[in-house]
């Protein structure tokens, strides 16, 4: 059974369709998608290794194949400032699978990125050199602003166009990015022009759980996690005081934390992306779901079909980050995104190639 947010593999040309910045007018009927160029995006984070293949489709893209594996590359990095040998070996094994899948497909273009674990580790560059030697994959370390932009680009379609703003957040393994997006006044759907402010904090589900503990999390420990994250975000929130005071914005989250919350809220027994991606949760439902998770023992979290053993020690740290965001940016609505960096990478490559301005990018 695939557990929410921890599924290893998804195959199928119709698994999911993501809207992009291409034109909306005209019929989306077109030629067979197999004639469209194929793109690949790989995101190596502190906790996960994720690969996505997609083709242009209408004004967006359609996923052909996806691969995701929890590797915990950043395990212990908050204490040692280094990637451990065990974590490196786990990650390289996953990257070998990615390399094999990429080699088996004729790609128009690909982009492979590494984020916080490789940014902050003293041996991050040495690790990527080893990855190149052992897998043939060349990964680039992206800075925090680029990571925030990519997450926003991947989720932009889920922002409510009727609100004055959106607080978009990506809760990662080693860091979390929060972006204020203004309303789209131009119709160009350009991420950078809408980013009024952004911040990246050094707290993700791995780093926060390693600092405070993720197995036995008392309510006092949970409150400490929330307060630590809130303190990091306070000054950022103050710069947006005029926007916050209007209340005319909503939250938009992308991460295993929010997809897990959505699954628990809906009572899912297995992963159903079509029910999670784009799901709206009200403030009371979020609070009730988090309260239920905080009240569980580690064993209860580990055996819950929406969490599983691989995330049982991380999910409460993610909830604490979300609660800190909610304290500073109170909103009646949260929209959940099962998309993010990889989709942002794919949209960027396709946009640069002008695929949505060419004839024949059919549905």
Question: What are these language model-derived features?
Answer:
Residues 34-62:
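N-terminal basic/disordered segments at the start of proteins
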């Amino acid at each position: 059974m695939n557990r929410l947010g921890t599924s290893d593999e998804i195959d199928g040309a119709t698994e999911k369709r993501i809207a992009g910045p291409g034109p909306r007018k005209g019929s989306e009927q077109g030629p067979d998608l197999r004639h469209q160029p194929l793109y690949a995006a790989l995101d190596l984070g502190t906790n996960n290794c994720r690969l996505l293949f997609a083709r242009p489709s209408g004004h967006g893209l359609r996923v052909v194949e996806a691969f995701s594996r929890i590797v915990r590359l950043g395990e212990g990095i908050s204490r040692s400032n280094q990637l451990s040998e065990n974590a490196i070996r786990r990650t390289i094994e996953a990257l070998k699978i990615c390399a094999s899948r990429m080699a088996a497909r004729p790609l128009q273009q690909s982009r492979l990125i590494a984020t916080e674990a490789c940014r902050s580790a003293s041996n991050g560059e040495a690790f990527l050199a080893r990855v190149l030697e052992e897998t043939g994959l060349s990964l680039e370390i992206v800075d925090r602003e680029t990571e925030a932009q990519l997450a926003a680009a991947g989720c932009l379609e889920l922002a409510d166009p009727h609100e004055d703003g959106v607080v978009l957040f990506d809760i990662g393994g080693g860091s979390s990015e929060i972006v204020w997006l203004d309303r789209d006044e131009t119709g160009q759907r350009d991420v950078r022009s809408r980013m009024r402010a952004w911040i990246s904090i050094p707290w993700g589900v791995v780093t926060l759980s390693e600092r405070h503990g993720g197995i036995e999390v008392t309510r006092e420990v949970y409150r400490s996690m929330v307060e630590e994250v809130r303190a990091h975000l306070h000054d950022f929130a103050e710069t947006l005081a005029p926007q916050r005071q209007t209340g005319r914005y909503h939250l938009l989250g992308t991460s295993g934390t929010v997809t897990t919350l959505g699954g628990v809220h809906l009572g899912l027994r297995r992963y159903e992306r079509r029910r999670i991606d784009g799901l709206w949760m009200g403030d009371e439902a979020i609070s009730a779901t988090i309260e239920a998770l905080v009240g569980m023992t580690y064993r209860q979290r580990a055996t819950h079909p929406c969490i599983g053993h691989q995330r049982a020690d991380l999910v409460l740290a993610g909830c604490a980050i979300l609660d800190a965001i909610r304290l500073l940016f109170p909103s009646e609505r949260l929209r959940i995104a099962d998309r993010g960096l990889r989709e942002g990478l794919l949209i960027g490559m396709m946009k640069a190639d002008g695929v949505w301005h060419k004839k024949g990018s059919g549905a």
